[in-house]
């Protein structure tokens, strides 16, 4: 994977995985140790996590598909009634194949996979890629959901969807949720998002995602946006689905026009 180099503190608090092993893993993804970075990628005995060392109260960012928020969402969430499920076109027995081209921490993708969709993940930031990979590997071992996730949720070893071939790597739906500069009020709501945005920043080239997404999608491209954000590429969608704080802009694929 050809990533531009990322400098971040690398720390091991694990009794099983050494700092040398963490450094070697990161080197494969062009991540190097930078002791001056306020961000740290930390290997604990349980997981890989991201911390903002100068703001410890923000807590750690990590991927957990088994417990916490995702367990609650799986058991008590809306399932097929969730906004993201409706946006990608889940209806009756129709379960579209999905490429989530801006996977982030994988939460929307997990919801779709738990419903039964085959979902492939693309994540271009190398640190987020490692967090996702770690979370998936742990979830694959879970007795309750491991087998389902091994069948339905896979992380692709590519950096950008323009590396995928529309003739062979297509899907029914391509899902885009590019990072967008948050209004200060909303940025303070989720502490985790502040850590994440410090690492990733806004997707300033998010407009470059729409064309390759349209080429890969047989049925539709779904773009999740804050309700105050402009359309991706300034391109009017065929229609939108609105929620309390977001909207899903939906562009029908060539076969559906």
From Swiss-Prot:
InterPro entries: 16SrRNA_methylTrfase_J, SAM-dependent_MTases_sf. One of its GO terms (cellular component) is cytoplasm. It catalyses: guanosine(1516) in 16S rRNA + S-adenosyl-L-methionine = N(2)-methylguanosine(1516) in 16S rRNA + S-adenosyl-L-homocysteine + H(+). S-adenosyl-L-methionine binds at residues 107-108, 123-124, 177. It holds the Pfam family SAM_MT. The keyword Transferase applies. Its EC number is 2.1.1.242. One of its GO terms (molecular function) is rRNA (guanine-N2-)-methyltransferase activity. The keyword Cell wall biogenesis/degradation does not apply. It is found in: Cytoplasm. Keywords: Cytoplasm, Methyltransferase, rRNA processing, S-adenosyl-L-methionine, Transferase. It is an enzyme of class 2 (transferase). HAMAP family: 16SrRNA_methyltr_J. Specifically methylates the guanosine in position 1516 of 16S rRNA. PANTHER family: RIBOSOMAL RNA SMALL SUBUNIT METHYLTRANSFERASE J. Belongs to the methyltransferase superfamily. RsmJ family. This is Ribosomal RNA small subunit methyltransferase J.
């Amino acid at each position: 994977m050809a990533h531009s180099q990322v400098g971040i503190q690398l720390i091991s608090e694990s009794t099983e995985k050494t700092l040398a092993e963490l450094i070697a893993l990161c080197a494969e993804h062009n991540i190097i140790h930078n002791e001056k970075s306020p961000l740290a990628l930390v290997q604990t005995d349980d997981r890989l996590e991201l911390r903002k060392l100068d703001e410890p109260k923000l807590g750690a960012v990590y991927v957990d598909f088994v417990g916490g928020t995702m367990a609650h969402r799986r058991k008590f969430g809306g399932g097929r009634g969730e906004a993201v499920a409706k946006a990608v076109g889940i209806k009756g027995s129709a379960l579209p194949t999905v490429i989530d081209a801006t996977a982030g921490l994988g939460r929307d993708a997990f919801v779709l996979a738990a419903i039964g969709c085959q979902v492939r993940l693309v994540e271009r930031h190398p640190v987020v890629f490692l967090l996702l990979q770690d979370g998936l590997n742990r979830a694959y071992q879970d007795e309750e959901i491991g087998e389902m996730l091994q069948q339905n949720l896979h992380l692709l070893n590519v950096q950008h969807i323009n590396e995928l071939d529309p003739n062979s790597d297509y899907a029914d739906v391509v899902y885009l949720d590019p990072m967008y500069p948050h209004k200060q009020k909303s940025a303070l709501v989720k502490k985790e998002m502040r850590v994440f945005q410090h690492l990733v920043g806004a997707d300033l080239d998010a407009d470059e995602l729409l064309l390759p997404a349209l080429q890969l999608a047989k049925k539709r491209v779904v773009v999740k946006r804050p309700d105050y954000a402009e359309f991706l590429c300034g391109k009017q969608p065929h229609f939108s689905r609105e929620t309390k704080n977001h909207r899903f802009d939906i562009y029908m694929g060539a076969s559906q026009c």
